């Protein structure tokens, strides 16, 4: 199985306004099939006021610029007709500040007030987030404070209230009825206060629905494993970082340690990736990787157990350094051609934000023999021929050599030997010659 993460606004335009939309996604299906994609993960498509969409103001309507329900259903049908599943990003930890529920709560409606989390006399109003020390409690003009783990524009939902739980289950049922195949659950480890409570929440929430459930649990292995048994698919942040760090530092030790933590002996499918919307792009890691190292990183990604996931544009070597608060740079328009005015091309409305496309576009890279795009297409073809690798076991054959990474992938009588060369010179392992920054599979 091969996944592909898409920021709809930047991917492909279907109505000539320069903004990606559902009709545009239909027009991109032939490319995604050629790339070997089995499912697409669409970042939030619901009504919201932000560019990223994680502050939903209505779970039953879509961003107007993306299209309406008819467009959405037609897009789903087109993907299914071509054998591609659709996974939606569903941020149910909170709503947007302008959601009807929160606006009614602000006006004093006791029913909707209980949909959110409010400070009591015992609340520590100086409580901070663990990852960046930002405040969690936010004041209103009347002196009340509400909880917003992800900022004042994203008030937390109160899942101690069973009505909130049922409201969000209705959203899930509605989307499944429209043909959605699964969900990526944002901030999945933050639904409840403790690990035990959080696991219990998700076990109950998912108990009567089927699909591809992909969880964002950015945490240590124990926490990931506990949730993995429920979700079935877990984003593997550990190995994602260590692939890039190993290639950047030219030392495989850190990757071997990560594989042992995050890929060995799991009863769920780790979903491996090289970048996403919450970090710098692969080609910009630590200031920038050479094209050779980008290719090697992708070779490693596609020769590990688990599900490989491509962040749109990584297959082209798109660049972008993640810096708050302006994180749009990692969500740049996807370059279909060298000419920004051609059909399907998206662009930012502010000309200064549009990056030059030269040498990065699909059009250019399909013609370039040694391009990153053709490199990754070789590996997606390899995975198509070896579906068993998703659940393969990994056996290390060479753990001491920092520039040579050798392992065997095994599953029910089938096996492959993988050799990665992280040096700038040819290396030999058991008679097999491996070119600089290259991979051989035997």
UniProtKB/Swiss-Prot annotation:
Residues given in the record as Ca(2+) binding sites: 13, 15, 17, 19, 21
Compartments it resides in: Cytoplasm
EC id: 2.4.1.25
The keyword Cell inner membrane is annotated on this UniProt entry: no
SUPFAM superfamilies, per the entry: (Trans)glycosidases, Glycosyl hydrolase domain
A single GO BP: oligosaccharide catabolic process
GO cellular component annotations of the record: cytoplasm
Catalytic reaction annotation: Transfers a segment of a (1->4)-alpha-D-glucan to a new position in an acceptor, which may be glucose or a (1->4)-alpha-D-glucan
Keyword hit for Nucleus: no
Site feature location: Transition state stabilizer: 278
UniProt cofactor(s): Ca(2+)
InterPro entries reported for this sequence: 4-alpha-glucanotransf_C, Alpha_amylase, Glyco_hydro_13_cat_dom, Glyco_hydro_b, Glycoside_hydrolase_SF, O16G_dom_2
Sorted UniProt keywords: Calcium, Carbohydrate metabolism, Cytoplasm, Glycosyltransferase, Metal-binding, Transferase
Noted pH dependence of activity: Optimum pH is 7.0.
Pfam families, sorted: Alpha-amylase, MGTA_C
GO molecular function, one term: metal ion binding
Temperature and thermostability: Optimum temperature is 85 degrees Celsius.
Entry's family note: Belongs to the glycosyl hydrolase 13 family.
Function: Hydrolyzes the 1,4-alpha-glycoside bonds in oligomeric and polymeric 1,4-alpha-glucans and transfers oligosaccharides (maltotriose being the shortest one) to acceptor maltodextrins.
Subunit structure: Monomer.
The name this protein goes by in its record: 4-alpha-glucanotransferase
């Amino acid at each position: 199985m091969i996944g592909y993460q898409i920021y709809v606004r930047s991917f492909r335009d279907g109505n000539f306004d320069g903004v990606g939309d559902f009709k545009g996604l239909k027009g991109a299906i032939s490319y995604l099939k050629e790339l070997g994609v089995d499912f697409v993960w669409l970042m939030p498509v619901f009504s919201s006021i932000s560019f990223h969409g994680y502050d939903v103001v209505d779970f039953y309507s879509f961003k107007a610029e993306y299209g309406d329900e008819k467009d959405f259903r037609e897009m789903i049908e087109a993907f299914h007709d071509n054998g591609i599943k659709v996974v939606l990003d569903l941020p149910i930890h909170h709503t947007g500040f302008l959601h009807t529920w929160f606006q009614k709560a602000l006006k004093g409606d006791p029913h909707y007030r209980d949909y959110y989390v409010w400070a009591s006399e015992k609340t520590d109003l100086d409580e901070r987030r663990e990852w960046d020390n930002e405040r969690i409690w936010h004041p209103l003009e009347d002196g009340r404070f509400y909880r917003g783990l992800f900022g004042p524009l994203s008030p937390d939902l109160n899942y101690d209230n069973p009505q909130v739980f049922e409201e969000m289950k209705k959203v899930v049922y509605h989307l499944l009825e429209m043909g959605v195949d699964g969900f990526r659950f944002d901030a999945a480890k933050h639904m409840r206060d403790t690990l035990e409570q959080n696991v219990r929440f998700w076990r109950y929430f998912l108990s009567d629905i089927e699909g591809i459930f992909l969880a964002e649990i950015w945490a240590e292995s124990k926490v990931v494993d506990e949730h993995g048994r429920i979700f079935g698919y877990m984003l593997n942040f550990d190995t994602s970082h260590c692939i890039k760090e190993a290639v950047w530092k030219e030392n495989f030790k850190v990757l071997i340690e990560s594989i042992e933590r995050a890929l060995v002996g799991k009863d769920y499918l780790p979903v491996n990736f090289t970048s996403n919307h919450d970090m710098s792009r692969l080609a910009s890691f630590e200031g920038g990787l050479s094209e050779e190292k980008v290719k090697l990183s992708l070779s490693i990604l596609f020769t590990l157990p688990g599900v490989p996931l491509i962040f749109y544009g990584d297959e082209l070597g798109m660049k972008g350094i993640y810096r708050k608060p302006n994180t749009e740079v990692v969500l740049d328009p996807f370059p279909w051609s060298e000419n920004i005015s051609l059909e399907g091309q998206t662009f930012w409305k502010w000309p200064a934000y549009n990056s030059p496309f030269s040498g990065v576009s699909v059009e250019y890279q399909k013609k370039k023999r040694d391009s990153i795009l053709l490199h990754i297409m070789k590996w997606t073809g390899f995975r198509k021929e070896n579906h068993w690798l998703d659940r393969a076991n990994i056996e290390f054959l060479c753990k001491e050599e920092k520039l040579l990474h050798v392992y065997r992938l095994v599953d029910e009588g089938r096996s492959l030997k993988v050799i990665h060369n992280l040096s700038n010179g040819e290396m030999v392992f058991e008679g097999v010659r491996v070119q600089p920054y290259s991979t051989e599979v035997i």
